[in-house]
């Protein structure tokens, strides 16, 4: 059986929490487009590290640079405030074993909470931006904000485009040249001419 839906939310999609379909399109739940597991890290105004997930991202570039495009970042969050204030973030790719830890950081993200401690993550100093990296990641993109735009014009979510200033992964991965399964995450890498 095949299903086809339009832009309007069908009746059968019930709301699980207040405002669910204000902040997220019903299509994000219906389409279930797979995404790699990653955490966006920033710093709160008081200097505490933050870690959060975002509904989706794309990573693209051309000869003018490589970019992390975060779509659907809620504008009422401290992560959004941090990005606007500091203009920087890290994208930390994590293996599936860190899923529960990442969810804990989302559930316990009050102003006074150290989200790295809540998730059990080790804070690592980034090389080119003044926000932390997660030591447990297998790949980090250190990004400087290029643009922040209201996604729908409703003042609810934003699209953030960050220029990747530095990327880093563990030494063990530097010899990869074909599809690998690294700590539970499958992706393709090819370094035929790159010397690291």
Model-derived segments and spans:
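Basic, polyanion-binding surface patches
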Residues: 1-196
